[in-house]
Regions:
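Ligand/substrate-recognition segments at binding pockets and active sites
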Residues: 361, 365-440, 455, 511
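Gly/Pro-rich hinge or "lid" segments in bacterial periplasmic/extracellular proteins
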Residues: 168-237, 241, 251, 545
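N-terminal lobe/hinge region of extracytoplasmic solute-binding protein
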Residues: 38-89, 207
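Extracytoplasmic/peripheral linker and loop segments enriched in polar/acidic and small residues
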Residues: 85, 356, 409-422, 449-516, ...
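Long beta-strand-rich cores associated with HINT superfamily self-processing modules
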Residues: 513-551
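Structural transition elements
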Residues: 331-371, 391-393
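Surface-exposed binding/hinge segments that line
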Residues: 116, 132-189
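Ligand-site clamp/hinge motif
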Residues: 229-274
Length: 551
């Protein structure tokens, strides 16, 4: 088996060599200070106003820099801003000074106007940003996005070249972390206007102000970064290169690790035991949850609450994560993930929710019986869209077997699609059911719960609940200064969502990584971008096999 895996790695490397992996050094070369990482899917854009998925966000976190970034404790720290915001007494006006040495990779200075331009672009209805709702706390953002006010009325103003004023609809306790999101990053107006709709579609149609810049992006193959010599803090960036290899097959990623072709790779469930004694193996639980979206618009039967509940309860999730992943993933019965935020008492918010969606074959059958009676039919058929990866294929087969075994008369078909195509179908509401996931962008339950409100671009299930919408509105408004009441309101909202079951939670994502012990300073985040690579360096005095100092 090991010989076969090695042959796979050699084959992959050979293909890369023949096609010319980069302009200078091979994608897999470990010469100098280079970090080589396998990623499970490609990014979709380099335009921060259009980003909706985790890989684009993660790469953006290395090549762009906003007012703030997340530290290793997932708290905001100054980046382009010189310090945390100065707040008015009512907490609704922020004054932010910018560092004068921040530059774009074309040499232009990063100015307050770059933030004004980018934020206005996000909420401009012409942009069609799926993340415009993230800016709802900024004064007039929702009205601008709805076309009811001009973009100039957005609550951001350049007081001078290096000073910003931000006006909020309401005081927001997590505003510093919110401003660390990629959606709030600046854009160079001159460059963005030059390329128009093509901005960010290729490596050379963008400029960068982060620690690194993209020099090579070959779709569904690789992304290569180099150190940004115009970055204000370049003297503290030790890596000269970052190479991402797109691989949908985790077994192939392990093969590349074994041949010293990459420094970090997620491995498949069946490989975990093989590496259980390896210094390279580490498991981490992310705050990402995976669930089945049930589209009531395309499948009218999904309007029946009992059918939705039956599907949620019919899946043995503990058995699923054990047999399919073996990587630290958790069976999930909640929508808001563990690790997202804490209650005023210091408890994990997710731990305070008693979900009705636990696996229960008997209850699932009872719900299905009620659904059949109310629907007046004994059979329901729908298609589940999943990503075209080996693990998602296995996942779909497992879910299909559970639903069809425990709910006789329900037939689930499976359609595998490239990630971008699957996502676009979701956003267009052109799907029946979709195996989807969500990672919180800031440390608050609303990072999840907001996405299921009526009209939210991520809520493409056609489910709508007025009470739920009001609870989220109150939590984002009048209750922001009342921690206890706000927490109780969000708990109630989560319970409504789970009892209505417009989505069927399946698992909270874990990852089993093989990481080169020479890699130092690597930070993983529970919220926001997956990693921070600014402080990473390769300590070649460490033995890659043992993790100990070389003799």
């Amino acid at each position: 088996m090991r010989k076969w895996i090695t042959l796979i790695a050699i084959f992959i490397i050979s293909l890369c060599t023949l096609s010319g992996c980069s302009n200078s050094k091979s994608l897999y070369s470990d010469e100098g200070q280079v970090f080589r990482k396998v990623i499970p899917q490609d990014m979709t854009t380099l335009d921060t106003t259009l980003m909706t998925e985790s890989v684009s966000s993660d790469v953006a976190g290395q090549v762009f820099e906003g007012l703030y970034t997340m530290d290793k404790r997932d708290q905001a720290e100054p980046a382009v801003a010189t310090k945390l915001p100065k707040k008015s007494k009512d907490g609704k006006t922020l004054t932010i000074n910018l560092r004068k040495d921040a530059k774009w990779s074309n040499g232009d200075p990063v100015t307050a106007n770059d933030f004004v331009f980018a934020w206005r672009k996000v909420v401009d209805p012409k942009t069609g940003s799926e993340f415009a709702y993230i800016m709802s706390d900024i004064k007039n953002a929702d009205q601008v996005n709805a076309g009811k006010k001009p973009v100039k009325d957005l609550g951001i103003k350049a007081l001078n070249k290096y000073k910003l004023q931000v006006k909020l609809e309401r005081p927001v306790p997590y505003i510093n972390e919110l401003l660390a999101l990629n959606t709030f990053d600046p854009q160079n107006e001159k460059v963005a206007n030059k390329y128009g709709k093509d901005y960010g579609t290729t490596a050379d149609k963008a400029v960068y102000n982060g620690p690194f810049k993209v020099v090579n992006w070959q779709v569904e193959d690789k992304i290569q970064l180099v150190k940004n010599k115009d970055y204000w803090d370049k003297n503290n960036v030790k890596l000269s290169r970052v190479n991402y290899k797109v691989l949908k097959d985790n077994q192939a990623g392990a093969a590349l690790y074994d041949t010293n072709s990459v420094d970090d790779a997620i491995i498949a469930a069946e490989q975990v035991d093989k590496y259980k004694n390896s210094i390279a193996l580490n498991k981490r639980l992310t705050a990402g949850t995976f669930f089945i979206k049930l589209n009531e618009k395309q499948v009218p039967e999904f309007k029946n609450k009992h059918l939705r509940l039956a599907i949620s309860k019919a899946i043995n999730k503990k058995q699923y994560v054990k047999s399919v992943f073996n990587d630290g993933s958790l069976a999930s019965n909640n929508f808001t993930a563990f690790g997202t935020s804490k209650t005023p008492e210091g408890k994990d918010f997710a731990s305070t929710i008693n979900s009705p969606l636990k696996y229960n074959e008997k209850e699932a059958k009872e719900n299905w019986k009620k659904a059949k009676k109310e629907l007046g039919k004994k059979k329901v058929t729908f298609t589940l869209n999943v990503q075209d990866t080996p693990v998602q294929k296995i996942s779909a087969e497992y879910i299909k077997s559970q639903i069809e075994k425990n709910l006789p008369g329900v037939q689930m078909k499976v359609k595998q699609l490239p990630f971008k195509q699957k996502t676009n179908l979701e956003l267009a509401n052109n799907y029946e059911a979709s195996y989807s996931g969500w990672v919180p962008d800031y440390p608050d339950p609303t990072a999840f719960l907001q996405t299921m409100t009526t009209g939210n671009s991520q809520n493409n299930t056609a489910w709508s609940n007025k009470e739920y919408d009001k609870l989220i509105k109150d939590a984002n408004g009048k209750l922001l200064q009342n921690e206890d009441e706000r927490n109780a309101t969000l708990q109630k909202a989560e319970r409504i969502l789970l009892n209505e079951a417009p989505v069927a939670p399946v698992y909270q994502k874990g990852e089993a990584h093989l990481t080169n012990p020479q890699v130092k300073g690597l930070v993983y985040h529970m919220v926001g971008p997956d990693t921070t690579l600014k402080d990473v360096y390769i300590d070649k005095s460490i033995d890659r096999e043992t993790g100990k100092k070389k003799k």
